[in-house]
C-alpha cells in the first residue's frame, strides 16, 4: 500500500536546481530580450492549478517558470526530449511529465491528475508545437 501511495506522488521540481536556473537565466533574459513580468493575478497562486499557455517561442517554458517563481511549476514536455541523456537528467530532476506527441496518452493524463493531487502547478502548452501566429491554435476534434 505504501509503495502505491509513493508512486502516486508527482514531486515539484528540485528546489536547488530551480533556484540555480532562476539566478542564472533571469539576468540573461533581462539583458538579451529586455524581459519583464506582469505577475498581477498571480500573487496568491498556489497549487493545485493547471496553466495553459500558447507556445510561441523556444523559451516559453523559461518565461513561464520565471513568471511563476517562487512557485516551482511542473511542466508537461514531449518525450523526445527524454532521449538525450544530459537533457533527460535535467528534466528528471525537474520532475516533468513526459507526453507522446500528437496522440492520446492516458499515462500523461494520469500523471497530470497525480500532480494535481500532489498540489502542483502544472503547465501545459496545448498546441504541442510552436505557433507561427503568436496566439493559440484552434482545438481539433
PLM feature spans:
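Helix-enriched interaction subdomains in cytosolic or periplasmic regions
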Residues: 5-24
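Soluble, non-transmembrane catalytic domains of enzymes that act on hydrophobic metabolites at membranes
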Residues: 1-2, 96
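Soluble catalytic domains of membrane acyltransferases
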Residues: 31-141
Amino acid at each position: 500500500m505504501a509503495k502505491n501511495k509513493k508512486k502516486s506522488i508527482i514531486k515539484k521540481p528540485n528546489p536547488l536546481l530551480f533556484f540555480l536556473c532562476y539566478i542564472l537565466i533571469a539576468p540573461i533574459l533581462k539583458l538579451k530580450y529586455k524581459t519583464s513580468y506582469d505577475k498581477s493575478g498571480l500573487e496568491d497562486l498556489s497549487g493545485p492549478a493547471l496553466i495553459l499557455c500558447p507556445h510561441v517561442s523556444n523559451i516559453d517554458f523559461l518565461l513561464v517558470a520565471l513568471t511563476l517563481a517562487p512557485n516551482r511549476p511542473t511542466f508537461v514536455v514531449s518525450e523526445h526530449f527524454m532521449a538525450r541523456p544530459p537533457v533527460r537528467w535535467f528534466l528528471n530532476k525537474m520532475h516533468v511529465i513526459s507526453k507522446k506527441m500528437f496522440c492520446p496518452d492516458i499515462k500523461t493524463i494520469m500523471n497530470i491528475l497525480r500532480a494535481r493531487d500532489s498540489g502542483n502547478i502544472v503547465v501545459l502548452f496545448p498546441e504541442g508545437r510552436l505557433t507561427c501566429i503568436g496566439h493559440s491554435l484552434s482545438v481539433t476534434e
